[in-house]
């Protein structure tokens, strides 16, 4: 699984060298931010059901046509699948926060997602809207500390950019 630490070590090993001072500084910064990442992961895990519901509701409010016949949310089963997908992405963001890297999203969430959604006629813009809603709804310090919010938002931005 990719993280700052595994990336630095892999690059150093591939070059047949020890990690450089800048490599170690990068790792140090990552470790210093770990408390904020873990706070964000804890807050997300503790509120994930509400986060997913609000994100999904916002998506269907913005893209009401998705509930029309022939669309991605034409019946309750398909609507539930959309909420399930949002939940899946939030779990992967949580895992990214825990490991301190984008490995979980890269390996389990992004690789091939656009192609799958295109094949199934599911608009990625709807998922992007739900994730952006979560990012934009975040309120510091109500939801988490400022640094935890920065860490959480960074992974949401990464996911938004990957699906866009």
From Swiss-Prot:
Gene3D superfamilies in UniProt: Phycocyanins
Membrane topology category: Peripheral membrane protein
One Pfam entry name: Phycobilisome
UniProt keyword Thylakoid present: yes
Binding site for (2R,3E)-phycoerythrobilin 1: 82
Any single GO CC term annotated in Swiss-Prot or TrEMBL for this entry: phycobilisome
Localization: Plastid, Chloroplast thylakoid membrane
InterPro entries, per the entry: Globin-like_sf, Phycobilisome_asu/bsu, Phycobilisome_asu/bsu_sf
Modification after translation, per record: Contains two covalently linked bilin chromophores.
Keyword set includes Lipoprotein: no
Record's keyword terms, sorted: Antenna complex, Bile pigment, Chloroplast, Chromophore, Electron transport, Membrane, Photosynthesis, Phycobilisome, Plastid, Thylakoid, Transport
Primary location class: plastid
Gene Ontology BP, a term: photosynthesis
Binding of (2R,3E)-phycoerythrobilin 2, residues: 139
UniProt subunit comment: Heteromer of 6 alpha, 6 beta and one gamma chain.
Job description of the protein: Light-harvesting photosynthetic bile pigment-protein from the phycobiliprotein complex.
Family of this protein: Belongs to the phycobiliprotein family.
Annotated protein name in UniProt: B-phycoerythrin alpha chain
